[in-house]
Curated annotation (Swiss-Prot):
Native source species: Methanosphaerula palustris (strain ATCC BAA-1556 / DSM 19958 / E1-9c)
Pfam families: Ribosomal_L3 (PF00297)
SS bonds (residue pairs): none
UniProt xrefs under InterPro entries: L3_arc_euk, Ribosomal_L3_dom_3_arc_sf, Ribosomal_uL3, Ribosomal_uL3_arc, Transl_B-barrel_sf
Name assigned to this protein: Large ribosomal subunit protein uL3
Oligomeric form and interacting partners: Part of the 50S ribosomal subunit. Forms a cluster with proteins L14 and L24e.
Cellular component, GO annotation: cytosolic large ribosomal subunit
Top-rank taxon, per record: Archaea
Keywords of this entry: Ribonucleoprotein, Ribosomal protein, RNA-binding, rRNA-binding
Single GO molecular function: rRNA binding
């Protein structure tokens, strides 16, 4: 007897598959953390891929202790700046913003993204924030950070990207002190996460435009005599006679790509300061020369070259412990074929 088991093609987990509202990914959850306060996210721009030769340090691996070739993604990570501190409170309707403290040292380029406050007292803002913390109305503290793409040569833009980053660890009083120390200053990736640790990488994927159901959902092409009707890359039917409408689960053509996706537990192999050491001959394809600090991540990450990539400490930590990998060779061979 024939096997009638036939699962549906494609996943409904991300429906509706429509374009992302912004190229800046958003996080709605943060890893639990103890100890001193720390920022829990960073952002950079995707440069390209290469490969390295490193020692396999995974315990019980068949190649443990031997040299292996690993594909890596390079992300350029110029320092980010902290523009403001935002306090949240919780009520019966959920979480909402309570107050904000803006720095007086804002980049003029940030004015192309948002309307900058003209007259603002940072000291008065922190005084009001401390009073709110003492009253017990503050539940979370977040930092508003922005990138500095004007320092890059591979990304043709000057307007910064503004994003919200949670401040984790410590008590609320310690978080306020930490916020006072970072507001208006530059922050590096090494202040968030270190080499050998695992991170979640989020980006807006490469846009494919409007695609048919075969490529978009992975349905089968019509076989044999069914393909003679002139519709080989279409679904067999749109559904039953009743109900008198097409169900949303039916695979149809539409937008493919340009959606937010997260890769969990990506290992950070190296955080470097001088990008010229790993720039291949002729530069990275569609990017050019790498001159700023960079991070080397094992495997691939979502999005095309020059796309904004957000990095967050892993929220689903695996069994592997953080160890600084022993990288013996980084390929700088030309990627132009």
């Amino acid at each position: 007897m024939a096997n009638i088991h036939r699962p549906r093609r494609g996943s409904l987990a991300y429906s509706p598959r429509k374009r992302a509202k912004s190229q800046v990914p958003k996080y709605h959850s943060w890893p639990a953390r103890d100890g001193e306060p720390i920022l829990q996210s960073f952002a950079g721009y995707k440069v390209g891929m290469t490969h390295v030769i490193m020692v396999d340090d995974h315990k019980n691996s068949p190649t443990e202790g031997k040299d292996i070739m690993v594909p890596v993604t390079i992300i350029e990570i110029p320092p980010m700046k902290v523009a403001a501190i935002r306090a949240y409170t919780a009520d019966t309707y959920g979480k909402r913003a309570l107050t904000e403290v803006w720095t007086e040292q804002l980049s003029t380029l940030l004015g192309r993204r948002i309307t900058l406050p003209k007259k603002y007292s940072e000291e008065a803002g922190f005084k009001a924030l401390s009073e709110a913390v003492a009253a017990g109305t503050v539940t979370e503290l977040h930092a508003l950070m922005y990138t500095q793409p004007d320092t890059l040569t591979g990304v043709p833009k000057k307007v910064p990207e503004l994003m919200e980053v949670c401040i984790g660890g410590g008590t609320l009083e310690q978080k306020v002190e930490f916020a006072q120390s970072i507001i208006g200053n530059e922050v590096n990736l090494a202040d968030v996460i270190g080499a050998g640790e695992y991170a979640d990488v989020t980006a807006i994927t490469t846009g494919k435009g409007t695609q048919g159901p075969v490529k978009r959902w992975g349905i089968m092409l019509r076989k044999r005599k069914h393909s003679r009707g002139g519709k080989k890359r279409h679904i067999g039917n749109l559904g039953p006679w009743n109900p008198h409408h097409v169900r949303w689960q039916v695979p149809q053509m539409g937008q493919m790509g340009y959606q937010q996706r997260t890769d969990f537990n990506k290992r950070i192999l190296k955080i470097g300061e001088n990008g010229t050491d790993i720039t291949p001959a002729g530069g990275f394809l569609h990017y050019g020369l790498l001159r700023n600090p960079y991070v080397m991540i094992k495997g691939s990450v979502p999005g095309p070259v020059k796309r904004l990539i957000r990095i967050r400490p892993a929220v689903r930590k695996g069994e592997h412990h953080a160890r600084v990998p022993a990288i013996e060779f980084v390929s700088t061979q030309s990627k132009q074929g």
